[in-house]
Amino acid sequence: MVLLRLLVFLFAPVVSDLCSLPCFINVSESQGPGTVLQFLSFNCSSYTPTPTLELLNVQPPTTFFNPPSLARWQGTYVGKLTLSSSAQLDALMVNHYKVQLKFTCGNHVMEGSLSVDVQRDLSHIQCAGQFASPAGEMIQVPETVTPGARLYTLLLPGLELHGAQMSIISAQDLPHFPGPFSINEQGWLQAPSQGLLGQAQKVFQLQISVSFGQRQSCQGMVIVKVLPVPSSQVSFLEQAQNITIPENLAPGSEVVQVQARGVDLRYEILSPVPSPLFSIGRADGVVRTTTPLELARTSGTAVSRLQVKAFEQGQLWASAKLNLTMNVQLVNLWPPRCLPALLVSQIPETAPVGTVLNTLTCEDPDSVGATLDYKLWFRSSSNPASLCLYDRVLEVNATLDCDTPGACFQHAASILVLDGGQPQMTTEVPVLVMVTPINEFSPACAPRTFRVQEDAAPHTLLGSVVGTDMDYPHDNIEYYTSGGPTTFAVDRLSGEVHLLGPLDYEQQRLYRLTVLVIDHGQDQNPNHHLSGSCTITIEVEDVNDHAPECEPPFQELTIYAPLGRSVEVTKMSCQIPQEPQRLIYSYSIVGGNSQNRFILQGAILVHSDLVLGPFWPEQPRTYELLICVADAGPSTPHLSTTATIIVHLVPRRASTVATSTHRTTVPSTMTPMLVTDTEAFWQPQPWFVVVLTATGALLLLALGWLLGRLLQGLAQLLQAPSKPAQALLLNSIQGTEGSIEGFLEAPKMEMSQAPSSVMSLHFDGRAQDSRTGRDYLFNTHTGARRWL
């Protein structure tokens, strides 16, 4: 019978702890296909998708187990694990299987292992194999075998633990036998004490009886064939080997492959028999494990000594022996465990060297109290000297100043914890150190001087104030003005200085503006700001924006100039009232100086007749001179004004008195008047022009279409006139004779529609219209009329 155990696993909604899975179940080797090995009960509140139970793998690999089934019964999911159709359990071959299962309930997944131990079945023990067959088990031994040597080992699985009794029941009488063969309780068939020399080619049949339990026995036959001295030699390259293997080798794992020299060799383990931990491949000599080698659970497995025999197939006397020592080494199964599993620290960048960030506590589950090794490994490219690890304490090793180029606000590292086991196990503890910025330095800006012309337009860019801040992020500052004139403004982000209002060089030539720079975003406290200031000087450059004015602007002079002499006519007095400091002007005659009789010497107008000769006028003459007065100097642009001087020149014959000048000036109150003519014009929006153009085009198209239709109808009427149409026209004329409109339009209609047939009508009467008094002719038959 199979031992069935119902294990209930409580889930929320699935089992949350893998340790609740069963550890071991026992099954008899006599169980065959379809045998139920285990029922598993699961609670799952998820119905979509349907819960599943899967078989992930089996160690050692085998096909003896069916995929588990899962069914719902009374609100609980019951899984069932059974043996497959190929199952042939044999405790001597493999007595332990590890089945890995996986249960899925919705998004929750649980994996666990089930250990299956195969148990021997005493009722299944019997003589089997060639030994129990009618032909028996044949062995071949050389005649040189040592007297009393072990020739054969009778293996009856399971009987070694139940005191089986073995004896040879066949006759061994002389002279057919050199001496009696013997067999002990361990199943060792031994050669006669006399040896087998001289018994070559002889065959000895030995009937062996095996008794065990209460009245249980079986019989078999061993046939010993004695062979002559072998012609070949079997040997190993070395007589002994020491092999070290880890304890975590799975059953069936290869340990070592032994090789001997010889022909058609076979291998077997001579001792211990049976071998509980190892087996050897008969043909390939590969030594494998048959059971887990866990030192903590199985005593006596640390060191195992095996004796391996290599022999030729068919010539058992041609053999050699090899001693193997198996050293099972303790395996380091668990890495160190550390608390906390993640180190996260936050410190200001001004933290001093030696500040303790965190302390790590670790232990080795495989060896409590063992010494562990700690190493600090940096993940990021930040300065590795910023942090250090003293034993288990993480400290600040160097300044964490983050004002230098390169981000240093986060240090990612790992602490590697290594144990001293084999293989060496390592635990990695992630370390994340976040450095918070501190606003340490006040921003600053350098004084600047900007120059701007007084005619600069508003919003003109004068320059930029450049502020600096040593805190990271660098130069993350804002600009403000502290008092000062409102004529200028500073951009808050860029520091650009713009002109807001008009300037006048004559009123103010120098401005001083205090700019305040404030940093932001450089401290974990958003309200912690530092500030600085600097003075900006703005110099206004003069621009020539006023034309000169002459006093008086108009003069009328009469001069008497003798022949051959130059006469000073007048000296002009011009200045710019708004700029009294400007004293340099240029003067030029731009009109009225016919024959070049006048010249300017600075501001003095001079009449010169040195070059006149015979062209001296006989009669007095008047000259209207236009004098252009412009400001001079480096200021641009140069502005000018025009003064008018009327000179009445009296020739030398006109008077005999001394030369004199008569001045007539325009009073200063009579200043030129500046007339501004503003011409108003209408400039429509572009969309209005487009709409108006489209509307006009559509209107022209409509008028053209209408005109075409009228012309077409008129042409048809003129080309094909009919009498009914003419009569209708005449009747319409008669119907409107009482109205003024009919009176006015009737002649036109008669004239426009006067075909030959109408014009040739005979009018036999004449009458006068009672309303209008006009005379008309009429036809008494047709009623047609013709106005006179």
From Swiss-Prot:
Topology, Cytoplasmic side: 708-788
Keyword rRNA-binding assigned: no
Subcellular location: Membrane
Lineage, broadest ranks: Eukaryota, Metazoa, Chordata, Craniata, Vertebrata
Name of the protein: Cadherin-related family member 4
Keywords of the record: Calcium, Cell adhesion, Glycoprotein, Membrane, Repeat, Signal, Transmembrane, Transmembrane helix
A GO CC annotation given for this chain: plasma membrane
Intervals, Extracellular compartment: 17-686
Superkingdom as given in the UniProt entry: Eukaryota
Residues annotated as signal peptide: 1-16
Domain Cadherin: 237-338, 339-449, 444-554, 551-674
GO molecular function terms listed in the Swiss-Prot or TrEMBL record: calcium ion binding
Function: Cadherins are calcium-dependent cell adhesion proteins. They preferentially interact with themselves in a homophilic manner in connecting cells; cadherins may thus contribute to the sorting of heterogeneous cell types.
A Pfam cross-reference name: Cadherin
BP GO terms, sorted: cell adhesion; homophilic cell adhesion via plasma membrane adhesion molecules
Transmembrane segments: 687-707
Membrane topology: Single-pass type I membrane protein
Positions bearing carbohydrate: 242
